[in-house]
A protein has these predicted regions:
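N-terminal, polar/Ser/Thr-rich
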Residues: 8, 38-46
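Bacterial Sec signal peptide processing site at the extreme N-terminus
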Residues: 30-39
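Divalent metal-dependent phosphoesterase catalytic cores across multiple superfamilies
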Residues: 43-187
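Gly/Ser/Thr-rich helix-start
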Residues: 17, 29, 61
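N-terminal secretory signal peptides and thylakoid transit peptides that target proteins
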Residues: 1-22
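C-terminal motif of bacterial Sec signal peptides marking the signal peptidase cleavage site
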Residues: 25-26
């Protein structure tokens, strides 16, 4: 009896696709996105990330044509994580090909909710493979830090090298976790 054989590449591709499917299903959003290819940013909020975006930004689940971008908005000082407090807040997001946001690719707006602890997961699609993008979030009175992400290589690509970095929930309250900086510095 012969057993089917999967190459390491096929196994990793299958595992990645399965994980993305689970996360995308679990983290759906009510995103009102717009293709703004080639346009410039219209966000005019003040850059005060500690006011509304105390938890920063993150990205993950890279596919050749998509990434997930994340943030947590703090709509009021008492809306700390896990409290269930804070009014629903309109949050704008942008993703661009440059750090100055002069070449926007997409933008949109979503509503945060205490039911989701004011965390936002945006599945940004229709991106180019192996491409770096910059992203950010804004409210009417706050602008998040800018994040940088990169899409995965095309499915038929054969890159000379491919590196993965994996992190899990770090419970920031127990340390500063310099490991994240080391991961970013290795890029």
């Amino acid at each position: 009896m012969s057993h089917p054989h999967l190459s390491r590449r096929q196994l990793l591709s299958l595992m990645g696709a399965s994980a993305v499917t689970v996360v995308a299903t679990a983290c759906g959003s009510q995103d009102d996105s717009t293709d703004t290819s080639g346009g410039s940013s219209s966000i005019t909020a003040k850059s005060d990330p500690l006011r509304r975006f105390r938890h920063g930004v993150a990205s993950g689940e890279p596919l050749p044509n998509a990434v997930v971008i994340w943030t947590r908005v703090t709509p009021s000082d008492d809306a700390l994580p896990g409290t269930g407090k804070g009014a629903a807040t309109e949050v704008f997001w942008e993703i661009a090909r440059d750090a100055e946001f002069k070449n926007l690719v997409q933008s949109g707006k979503v509503m945060s909710s205490a039911l989701r602890d004011h965390t936002l997961h945006i599945d940004v699609t229709e991106l180019q493979p192996s491409t770096s993008y910059w992203y950010r979030f804004a409210t009417t009175d706050g602008l998040s830090p800018t994040g940088r992400t990169k899409t995965a290589p095309a499915l038929n690509a054969k890159p000379a090298a491919l590196r993965f970095g994996m992190v899990t929930c770090a419970e920031y309250e127990f340390g500063f976790f310099a490991g994240y900086r080391h991961l970013a510095d290795r890029n």
